[in-house]
Amino acid sequence: IMACGTGKTFTTLWVKERQFAKSTLVLLPSLSLLSQTLREWTFAANETFDVLCVCSDQTVGKQSNTDEIIHSVKDMSFPVTSEPQEISAFLKGDGNKVIFSTYQSSPLIAEAQIDTLVPDFDLVIADEAHRCTGTTGNAFTTILDQSLIRANKRLFTTATPRTYSANLKKKSSEMGVDVTGMDDEAIFGQVLYALPFGEAIKRGLLTDYQVVLVGVDNPMIADWIQRRQLIQTDENNAVD
């Protein structure tokens, strides 16, 4: 668990290298984040690795906090596949291999591993892992089932761990709905490391935020209207 901006992407790469993982799966919620993570891993890696990206136009996710928005796999700067047979062939090969995939395409990984000759992953990294919580039985929870995606180790990373109250879990159970939170150690394991926002500020890893309050009252607003005072917006639009 690491606050946004403290280096989760590089940390996961270094974990992979320290674990000497030769077969790695990295799951991400959008094409934009997948592209960004692949670029950063390639830039910072201490060893080379072969890459296969698994995604399709149906796996496009909404990602508002990125510098680029990728709406189609045609906009990707690297080859992609959505064929389980190609995934199987890649995983059967030798060398240091990394598959980058969207969560939405993770069932394709599971389909590829139906072939018993396809080895287990040494390591699976589930980024933005809070997306794996909630109701089970969807593409985002495929990674939680060892019988679907076989892996020796799983690492779940997030800045915002999501949990559910005992009352909500009870009500969901009464309705026949399974709800999983990140506090379920049987599924997500124990917290390996936590760097909350406040601690990151203390360490100088993040800049402290400032809250600015601007107080106005009705007479002040009426005066502005009377004088047709111009207001400059962040987009440099003048409004009167």
Describe each region flagged by the PLM.
Residues I1-V15:
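Walker A/P-loop
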Residues F20-N46, D50-Q63, Y103-S105:
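Conserved Walker A/P-loop ATP-binding site and its immediately adjacent core
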Residues L31-L33, Q58-G61, Q104-P107, H130-R131, ...:
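Conserved nucleotide-binding/hydrolysis micro-motifs of P-loop NTPases
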Residues C53-P84, T102-L108, R131-G134:
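Conserved helicase motor
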Residues S77-S82, L117, R131-D145, L168-M182:
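Substrate-gripping "pore-loop 1 plus following alpha2 helix"
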Residues P84-D120:
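Conserved helix/coil segment N-terminal to the catalytic DExD/H
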Residues S105, I114-F156, T160-T163:
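SF2 helicase catalytic motif II
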Residues A166-D240:
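Interdomain helical connector at the RecA1-RecA2 junction of SF1/SF2 helicase-like NTPases
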